[in-house]
């Protein structure tokens, strides 16, 4: 199945049902009073994370989604039934953004998690609600409010502990094949990897972490060169980044300059992503003599002015990959757990906070119920005239 990590959709919640004007009329009950029921609430639209989904391709072809409208109220105090909620299944790791306001609505990071993206309209009131000691036969009602309408941008961000980044043909896909059972395509030409790949690494029995491989970056990627930087978003949730360098590029280019270009593209995309823990990993060390290897590594590190962790490996021959996997496992285990809980005291102002209150007045502005204040049933009775 084709991997699609972005989709734009339009969601419409159901309108609320209108109230009913009705009166109880039975034999021997001439003054039964009002019995108009309320309308039903409109159905809401939810996103729900499902681990059985791994792409947003369905929403590329089906863009409009509408929940059910609430039914109108009826006589005998019958309340209209509420509209059925619409639940849209999305992959775990999906982020929902309002296309108009660019506000982040929420992230779905766990299987079964639900997110309200469009709230159904409120129900209208029947005339029973307006009965009072001075108004025994009210003839007013209210209409249901419209449901919320949103244009959403869905973004799928892969959930991984370790992210791989580097130039094309640095050996990222070869590394993920060496340490996991993932089988991304490997070839001797640039941009072999066209979509992100995930692999589960098991360095020790019962202990594992997830690693993500994204297409390679080149200088100018932020301006659209190569495959651009659109896949960098899949590294945003990673705990640590592995910056893989070809220690001896076949084209004679400088590994230090290549590394600086990658860092520059990271900073252009997101300073927060560029500030994540990053390890420098030199690959293809089997192509050099052992006595020249350390000297070459030291020279590149000095040219980069690198102060972080440095590792060497040969992903093709699986030399140093096991040790690196164990280091990653221990490092991830030492990090504090990610707190995904939401502060219940935090106040977040969304676009639709006052939506229903604002619409309640507008949808009912045509209803003038002043004539109800002095309404008397006797005014509508049959007039009997006696003559002598």
UniProtKB/Swiss-Prot annotation:
Localization (cell): Cytoplasm
Gene3D superfamilies (alphabetical): GTP1/OBG domain, P-loop containing nucleotide triphosphate hydrolases
UniProt keyword annotation of Chloroplast present: no
CDD domains in alphabetical order: Obg
Domain OBG-type G: 160-333
Enzyme's top EC category: hydrolase
Domain Obg: 1-159
Gene Ontology terms, MF aspect: GTP binding; GTPase activity; magnesium ion binding
Entry keyword Hydrolase: yes
Pfam hit, one: GTP1_OBG
HAMAP family referenced in this protein's UniProt entry, alphabetically: GTPase_Obg
Database matches in PANTHER family: DEVELOPMENTALLY REGULATED GTP-BINDING PROTEIN-RELATED, MITOCHONDRIAL RIBOSOME-ASSOCIATED GTPASE 2
Family membership noted in the UniProt record: Belongs to the TRAFAC class OBG-HflX-like GTPase superfamily. OBG GTPase family.
Assembly information from the UniProt record: Monomer.
Described function: An essential GTPase which binds GTP, GDP and possibly (p)ppGpp with moderate affinity, with high nucleotide exchange rates and a fairly low GTP hydrolysis rate. Plays a role in control of the cell cycle, stress response, ribosome biogenesis and in those bacteria that undergo differentiation, in morphogenesis control.
Protein name per the record: GTPase Obg
Species per Swiss-Prot/TrEMBL record: Shewanella denitrificans (strain OS217 / ATCC BAA-1090 / DSM 15013)
Taxonomic lineage: Bacteria, Pseudomonadati, Pseudomonadota, Gammaproteobacteria, Alteromonadales
Name of the gene encoding the protein in the UniProt record: obg
